[in-house]
Amino acid sequence: MTFIGVDHGTTAMRFALIEDEKVLTFELGRAEAAAMSEKEILAAIEREFGIRIGDIDLVALTYSMGDGFSAIKDVRKLEGRGLQSIEGAGKKTGGGTRVFDAVRNSEIPAIAIPGLHSGSRVDPRMKVFSHLTSPEKLGIAYHILCLGYEDFVVSDISSNTVTLAVVAGKVIGAIDACIFAPGVHHGPLDLQAIRNVDDRLQTANQAFIEAGTLKMTPYKDREELLKAAGKGEKPALLALDTIALFAAMEIASMQLLMKDYGTTGTVFLAGSVGEVEYVQKKICTHLDQECLSLGKWHAAIGCAEIARDVSAGKKQILGVNVDYP
């Protein structure tokens, strides 16, 4: 049987296929996907995976914040695309929308994975925040669960930083990108950002997508920053030191929540910055704990694993109810 997971990432749409023991992956840049037609999206899936659309048993989609629903469900039963609003924290390119619509408007069986928000089944104290994490992070967490870990924290560190806590195989809480630890591009609004928004110098969303550690440096993007860090340039290392410090704080805060459930769990680091050895070592030192690392494909692979297990009849994923078929 053939299952596909789709990770709506910050910079790319990543696809993973699971067929028995075989795992295949490919990605489309978000701008690249936005420029394609729905037919071209489906053709790319067929070409890259060497399959026909009719061979796919189930696709698990993630889209944007996923804050308009709280159970995994048939994508065609969603109101709109499963969002409370298209406005929010992040840059809009249209690539995720094109992929979502291509699958929904096809004959492929498909489910949508929700994000975690105030309507989700998490520790009630976390519901002070309206939104906790977008759907693809559940893909990462489910992949870790499939690896055999039931109690863990996973911090996805890249353009932004998002951290989830899982106890006994269920998500109990998460800290979203706009709340605490900054990433390279995105971060929480500080005092000056709030003043800028109030003075109408920028929108809140613009402030969010410019609040990462890149603003501390002369570099234009994540790739340039990481390249400079590899050369030992001080501004780049300071930016990574800052990310590592706040990511460690965020992980520790999730472990504090987990203590109420009798565990602190294994720590996993994911994302393009979480994969950097320099950052990993800093975080491990801050936490005085070893951390395990995941690659950039694990969100999509985890979504494919969700599709596989939902197809087999599973009615709960990480504590999230399944309303399918």
Swiss-Prot record:
Note the SUPFAM superfamilies from the entry. Actin-like ATPase domain
Q: Which family does it belong to?
A: Belongs to the UPF0285 family.
Instruction: Give the protein name, as stated in the record.
Output: UPF0285 protein MA_3856
